[in-house]
């Protein structure tokens, strides 16, 4: 009796990025093949049939030359990281998205979930790994990962724990994408932007903190709500630290070029009968309110980061209030990162806008700088 010996290949999907790794490839007799366990994700396919289908379906027409490739990597697949990912994908800004996280199960699950929607985003090249090699040759790397504050922990201790994490992340990013731009989203964002700048040794234009871009969006939204006008038509800035000591620039708030301060000279002060200062107080309080209700903030910061990403990758040269080194401006002598209006393009921050501040606004900015410096000077980087 003679046997026909088929050639088979066993492959198992072991990665959420869709890579199939050959685990078995041999000629088997029927008795041997019957003893191979077929449980789990193992799959046997005729090699010759796959090759035939492909060769019958597709014929090479020309050799493919490398083209301009736009790649963004996101470090951290928590609620903020994934909000950044989907916001960027829906804008159609990139050719490749890479995700990195230490939680391999969540990382693969989130990646598969995005991949399965790639028909709707028109961007199928979504990859992931615990290893930073997957981020190689990124144009832009967005860091959302970081340690969370524990009960009773001081801000300095929290920052120091994040410094340890950043040492690992930044060294890997620099190794694989030495020419990338960095957007830091992890909190406290201003201090960690400074840490990333120091650890990476990148030029200052290539390290950008998400800073007050979201604070400013909230500010404009709330002004619009009060006036019954769309937020895009409300012009105003929140500068300084992202957080409780941020500075509302009431002197520059205007609608269609009409300064609100010309209509209400006390706007934003305690003397203001309309209590416009409550708008800024709500900007600060709203994040805490959202966290209290849903446990975290995600969508607005994700959209904010996608907005910054668009300005950089498309070289739009739009102005954003992002965190950058501010030493030498507004009488600030400390080497700190704070938000001021910056022009963003393909090289990162190309110019700073020297926005005119009142003496009171400038004093608040200086106070913000000193608050950050008191923490930064104690850091062990």
UniProtKB/Swiss-Prot annotation:
One GO BP annotation of this record: lactate metabolic process
Catalytic activity line of the entry: (S)-lactate + NAD(+) = pyruvate + NADH + H(+)
Domain of life (superkingdom): Eukaryota
Gene Ontology molecular function: L-lactate dehydrogenase activity
Binding site for substrate: 155, 187, 218, 297
Family: Belongs to the LDH/MDH superfamily. LDH family.
Keywords on record: NAD, Oxidoreductase
Cellular component terms (Gene Ontology): cytoplasm
CDD domains in the record: LDH_1
Active-site residues per Swiss-Prot or TrEMBL entry: 242
Protein name as annotated: L-lactate dehydrogenase A-like 6B
Binding site for NAD(+): 101-106, 148, 187
Documented EC number(s): 1.1.1.27
PROSITE patterns per record: L_LDH
UniProt entry tagged with the keyword Nucleotide-binding: no
Keyword NAD set for record: yes
């Amino acid at each position: 009796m003679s046997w026909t010996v088929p050639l088979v290949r066993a492959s198992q999907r072991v990665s959420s990025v869709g890579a199939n790794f050959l685990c078995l490839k041999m000629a088997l007799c029927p008795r041997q093949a019957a003893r191979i366990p077929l449980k789990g994700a193992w799959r046997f396919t005729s090699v010759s049939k796959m090759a035939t289908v492909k060769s019958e379906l597709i014929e090479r027409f020309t050799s493919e030359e490398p083209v301009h490739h736009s790649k963004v990597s996101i470090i951290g697949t928590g609620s903020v990281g994934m909000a950044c990912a989907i916001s960027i994908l829906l804008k159609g800004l990139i050719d490749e998205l890479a995700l990195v996280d230490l939680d391999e199960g969540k990382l693969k699950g989130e990646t598969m979930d995005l991949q399965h929607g790639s028909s709707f985003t028109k961007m199928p090249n979504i990859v992931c790994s615990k290893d930073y090699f997957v981020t190689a040759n990124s144009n832009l790397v967005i860091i959302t990962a970081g340690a969370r504050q524990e009960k009773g922990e001081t801000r300095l201790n929290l920052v120091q724990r994040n410094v340890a994490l950043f040492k690992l992340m930044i060294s890997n990013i620099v190794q694989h994408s030495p020419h990338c731009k960095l957007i830091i989203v992890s909190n406290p964002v201003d201090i960690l932007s400074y840490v990333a700048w120091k650890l990476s040794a990148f030029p200052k234009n290539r390290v950008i903190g998400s800073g007050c871009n979201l604070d400013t969006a909230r500010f404009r939204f709330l002004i619009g709500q009060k006036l019954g006008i769309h937020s895009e038509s409300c012009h105003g800035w929140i500068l300084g630290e992202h957080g409780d000591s941020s500075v509302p620039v009431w002197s520059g708030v205007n609608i269609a070029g009409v300064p609100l301060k010309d209509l209400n000279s006390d706007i934003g002060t305690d003397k203001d009968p309309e209590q416009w200062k409550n708008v800024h107080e709500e900007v600060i309080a709203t994040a805490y309110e959202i966290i209290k209700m849903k446990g975290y903030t995600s969508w607005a910061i994700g959209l904010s980061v996608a907005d910054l990403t668009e300005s950089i990758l498309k070289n739009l040269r739009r102005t954003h209030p992002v965190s950058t080194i501010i030493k030498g401006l507004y009488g600030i002598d400390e080497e700190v990162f704070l938000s001021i209006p910056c022009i963003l393009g393909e090289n990162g921050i190309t110019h700073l806008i020297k926005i005119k501040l009142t003496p009171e606004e400038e004093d608040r900015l200086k106070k913000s700088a000193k608050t950050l410096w008191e923490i930064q000077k104690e850091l062990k980087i």
